[in-house]
Amino acid sequence: MTVTLGMPAAPARPLGTRRHSRQINVGNVPVGGDAPVSVQSMCTTLTSDVNATLQQIAQLTASGCQIVRVAVPSQDDADALAAIARKSPIPVIADIHFQPKYVFAAIDAGCAAVRVNPGNIKAFDDKVGEIARAAKGAGIPIRIGVNAGSLDKRLLAKYGKATPEALTESALWECSLFEEHDFRDIKISVKHHDPVVMIQAYRLLAQSCDYPLHLGVTEAGPAFQGTVKSSVAFGALLAEGIGDTIRVSLSAPPVEEVKVGTAILESLGLRQRKLEIVSCPSCGRAQVDVYTLANQVSAGLEGMEVPLRVAVMGCVVNGPGEAREADLGVASGNGKGQIFVKGEVVKTVPEAQIVETLIEEAMRLAEEMTADGTPSGEPSVTVS
């Protein structure tokens, strides 16, 4: 008897075809089209405190942030925009709510883009023509940022709550107003705190327009909860080819948002991988403290800028096999560790020397890879 498993002749594409979107430029960062998915964050400082804001932007830039947003709730904040936009190493987006006058202030200040929330700016529809002319004159894009928590009351009355359809209709309606003034330098976000609603809304948008999409789960929560929500939502959409720029919203320092966002892109193969640790959950077979060993190796290799794969294994079940598949690895057991380099055992060391030995070997391999012209960027570590 012949059993057919229905396996494809060739591996399926890991991700869906990238959605075609028009490309805009936020400062020197292209968004949409064939441009890589970019990572954004938002300052938590008072925008009026120029020095504090610029210091935080410098930290975000160092962590890999490509575009930063700042809040503009007051005239003092609006007055600070010019200095911030001029001195920031990355493009600055002004985040505007309630007061349309700050949209014009942000454009005049030289911000790279402006985010507007049509749900809470009074008489926003009446100002679209002026905003479109000002933005077009300055050559900057507008982000139409719809949020479930501030949805237009007309749409709440129509749909009863912030449904995917309501979020999408709000965004497309505002786009149509800008289009009436021949302005299409637009990107869109439709954020919701529920990842499922958010995913559905972005799918609707992706089918309805070709504007670039900014992905975000609003009010995602503390670091752990927000990371889970954003990872689920972004992973689902990006795997379908939907999404051109992302911001992970966390009740945590903004640098953490950038780290999580970058890691999501790396996990999907949309960025060259950095230090990656894949560790087993540990079990009764483990003959070493996997948790401690993994954390020590991770800390010791943090910041390495070559795509090096390191395996740190806690038992003999998967250990030798995983270690052989890596550039560098250790299979631990019986108080010692076998060190593998390119699949071959090169030495056996006492357990107390495993971390030190791995770091030394990793540095040596990194130097060799750099000398060989390996693209810098991001080591990969496997722990199990």
UniProtKB/Swiss-Prot annotation:
Record's cofactor remark: Binds 1 [4Fe-4S] cluster.
Catalytic function, reaction form: (2E)-4-hydroxy-3-methylbut-2-enyl diphosphate + oxidized [flavodoxin] + H2O + 2 H(+) = 2-C-methyl-D-erythritol 2,4-cyclic diphosphate + reduced [flavodoxin]
Residues that bind [4Fe-4S] cluster: C280, C283, C315, E322
UniProt xrefs under InterPro entries: Dihydropteroate_synth-like_sf, IspG_bac, IspG_bac-typ, NO2/SO3_Rdtase_4Fe4S_sf
Pfam family, one: GcpE
Signal peptide: none
Keywords: 4Fe-4S, Iron, Iron-sulfur, Isoprene biosynthesis, Metal-binding, Oxidoreductase
Enzyme Commission numbers on file: 1.17.7.3
Matches recorded under Gene3D superfamilies: Dihydropteroate synthase-like, Sulfite Reductase Hemoprotein, domain 1
Requisite cofactors: [4Fe-4S] cluster
GO biological process, one term: isopentenyl diphosphate biosynthetic process, methylerythritol 4-phosphate pathway
Pathway listed: Isoprenoid biosynthesis; isopentenyl diphosphate biosynthesis via DXP pathway; isopentenyl diphosphate from 1-deoxy-D-xylulose 5-phosphate: step 5/6
UniProt-recorded Gene Ontology molecular function terms: 4 iron, 4 sulfur cluster binding; 4-hydroxy-3-methylbut-2-en-1-yl diphosphate synthase activity (ferredoxin); 4-hydroxy-3-methylbut-2-enyl-diphosphate synthase activity (flavodoxin); iron ion binding
Keyword presence, ATP-binding: no
Keyword Cell division set for record: no
HAMAP family in UniProt: IspG
Function: Converts 2C-methyl-D-erythritol 2,4-cyclodiphosphate (ME-2,4cPP) into 1-hydroxy-2-methyl-2-(E)-butenyl 4-diphosphate.
Protein family per UniProt: Belongs to the IspG family.
Record's protein name: 4-hydroxy-3-methylbut-2-en-1-yl diphosphate synthase (flavodoxin)
Source species of the chain: Frankia alni (strain DSM 45986 / CECT 9034 / ACN14a)
Lineage of the species this protein comes from: Bacteria, Bacillati, Actinomycetota, Actinomycetes, Frankiales
Annotated gene: ispG
